[in-house]
A protein has these predicted regions:
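Short, conserved phosphate-binding/catalytic loop or strand-edge motifs used
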Residues: 169-173
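Aromatic- and Gly/Pro-rich amphipathic surface segment
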Residues: 76-102
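C-terminal segment of N-terminal export signals and the immediately downstream linker at the start
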Residues: 23-62, 283, 290-300
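Long, compositionally biased charged/polar accessory segments in the mid-to-C-terminal portions
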Residues: 196-300
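Right-handed parallel beta-helix
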Residues: 101-120
Length: 300
């Protein structure tokens, strides 16, 4: 009866493979996120006001229990000689650029997660470890993360950082918009400590109105562009500058949300986890055949 079982298995395996192929070949459409609150929060960064004190870096580390030196050491500007990116040790950094309008006063730019309205990191994550909250924040859940790092590839701003120093339980590190602080009615740590109010926290729609008003009143001071108002579908963090944003290492991005590409690829590959299931079924079948190939045929 072994041959009969083998025939049945082959028929079943063929059926599973065909079914899996037909299901996984159905085009998957990028999910539309839940409607965000019109009153969602944001931050306006005015790079013409920032003085590069880096107090925001210190406050961020303090708020997130990251190792840091005393605040008074951050006045050392020598670190600004190199361009840095947020990483596992610093969720926000400040970089310095030359100012074409005044060579004596550089342009300092704070860098962190932009908290996209339609985040590519969330769409690329196959286990739903990222959440876009109604108030605008994009957060990450360590309990769900499997360490695939697709979020790092998907992010148009190259922000998520991986804790390579932790071999067993690494985290994805990025700004969380001080989610726990703002839930309690507090300001984000970086906003609270800024001595010159270069970063302003408030309703995103109000911040956009403020930014447009500044541009209108001071056309010689600002370029006519609010970075983040429309880029990749809009971001919670917004920027004003006195020079082209490309000169400040801010990428040129279209207005279409980035998840349009990442979701169609990732969700197409992993839809229903059918391809992995089909693979496991096939491998199990091969093992069954090898185990039973030398058994004698049963005769009725």
């Amino acid at each position: 009866m072994a041959s009969q079982n083998r025939r049945n298995f082959l028929k079943t395996a063929a059926f599973i493979g065909a079914s899996a192929a037909s299901i996984s070949s159905v085009p998957t459409k990028a999910k539309t996120p839940d409607k965000l609150q019109e009153s969602r929060m944001g931050v306006l960064v005015d790079t013409t006001v920032c003085i590069g004190c880096r107090n925001c870096e210190w406050a961020c580390k303090e708020a997130h229990n990251l190792e840091t030196d005393p605040l008074n050491t951050y006045s050392n500007r020598s670190i600004l000689d190199i361009k840095r990116r947020p990483d596992e040790h610093a969720l926000t950094v400040v970089n310095e650029y030359s100012n074409p309008k005044n060579q004596l006063i550089p342009t300092d730019v704070k860098v962190q997660c932009m908290h996209c309205d339609d985040p590519a990191c969330a769409s690329a994550c196959i286990v739903g470890a990222f959440t876009k909250h109604e108030n605008g924040a994009v957060t990450w859940d360590s309990d769900k993360c499997i360490g695939c790092r697709y979020c790092m590839i998907a992010c148009p701003f190259q922000v998520p950082a991986f804790e390579y120093s932790k071999a067993l339980e690494p985290n994805i590190m990025k700004c969380d918009f001080c989610f726990d602080r703002t839930k309690e009615g507090k300001l984000p740590a970086c906003v609270e400590i800024c001595p010159v109010e270069a970063i302003t926290y408030g309703k995103r729609e109000d911040l956009i109105a403020i930014a447009h008003d500044r541009i209108k009143r001071h056309p010689d001071k600002y370029i006519n562009h609010i970075m983040g108002e429309h880029e990749v579908g809009g971001t919670s963090w917004l920027y004003l500058a006195g020079q082209d944003f490309t000169k400040l290492d801010i990428p040129v991005l279209g207005e279409d949300p980035a998840p349009g590409v990442t979701e169609s690829i990732q969700h197409g590959i992993f839809a229903y986890f059918i391809p992995p299931i089909a693979l496991y079924a096939l491998l199990g079948g091969v093992m069954w055949l090898n185990k039973n190939k030398n058994k004698p045929e049963e005769v009725f």
